[in-house]
Amino acid sequence: MILVDTSVWIDHLRRGDDALAALLDAGQVLAHPFVIGELALGALQPRELVLQSLDDLPQATVATDQEVLRVIDRYALWGLGIGYVDAHLLAAARLTPGAALWTRDRRLAGAAEKLSLAAEPAATSGTGRSR
C-alpha cells in the first residue's frame, strides 16, 4: 500500500497521473487525514466528489503527536527542511504495515528514503511522471 502525499495528488488532480490512476484501480492507495485536509484547503473541482473519494480510500494509521516526536528523534529528522505534517506522514507510513510514502517533495522524499519508506511508482510502472 502506498500513502500518497499532497504533492502527488495535486499533480493528479490538475493533469492526471497514470501511475496514481493505476494504483487507485489496483486498490493500493492509502489516504491520511492531513493530506485530505491540505487538499481541502485548495480549490478542488468538483470539491465534494474529490473529498468524498479521498475519504473513501483506506486510511493509513494516524500517529499520535508523541509517536511523531519519537520518529523525529529516532531517525534524526530535525534540520532536514521537512514540516510537522511531513513528519506525521512518515510516522504514519512507519506505523502502517507494508506502507510506503510517495511524494514529489524533494526533502520529504529524502527523509522517506532515510527511513526506507520511499515509494516511486512512476519509476517502476513507467506510466507516470516524476520530478
Where are these regions (language model features)?
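Active-site neighborhoods of divalent-metal-dependent phosphate/nucleic-acid chemistry enzymes
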Residues: 12, 18, 59-131
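Short, well-structured N-terminal submotif of metal-dependent ribonuclease cores
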Residues: 1-34, 40-52, 58, 118, ...
